[in-house]
């Protein structure tokens, strides 16, 4: 015969009951998982980013052939290759991908700027393929503004002779000039060739002094290593007859294709260390003096033009 015996609710029994209820609640709640979301776990490619959103490099040395852009990541354990897209013009080539070595937190993306023209401002962008990065935290695109510039180095002092603007009845009017060279290029600047206003007056008159005067004449040696060009024209500081009648020293072919053959008269003499210029002297809208008045540059270390001419 079964006899019911009432148990005493000691503190030990109460603790057991409470523990059982807690375990039941945990088991019940663990079954209700329909609203849980996947937890984000970083992997090596999701950390890749450009280090700058905008890159402005407008003084790239003209002789430089590549330009480096840095990418970074926070998880360097594994090697990874990241795809890159570019909107840069065809004169600049960018690789289609960049690789991080295992253990490295940075990678260098080198773009080829060897065909980038000097003086022109180039704009474009580079972007990381979205499948390789977490766009919520990474700099996915970097915008670039690039330009090349010559690095000018002084060669020292030379001499400048101008048969039209500086020579007078009593003097050759030869002027001391600083000569600069573009580093890595056969390109030169003759600095302040018409700074001597008194000599211009002696050659012409005070009434012929104008307001436009070239701070330098920039010229370059052509690929035939004989002829030189200066592209457009320079101002000699003189006017012919009142305002707006500047006397300009044109590259003949720039003034007119009719005079293109006269370009060949302008030559460098490396043996004598001189350059002969035959500009077409012209006043816009009026006419000119043709190419019969040459100019001569004696390089630093070249001859004294008083004796040479």
Report the location of each language-model feature.
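Alpha-helical transmembrane segments
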Residues: 21-25
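Ser/Thr/Gly/Pro-rich, low-complexity flexible regions
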Residues: 149-309
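C-terminal motif of bacterial Sec signal peptides marking the signal peptidase cleavage site
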Residues: 27-30
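Acidic/polar, low-complexity intrinsically disordered N-terminal segments immediately downstream
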Residues: 2-7, 14, 32-166
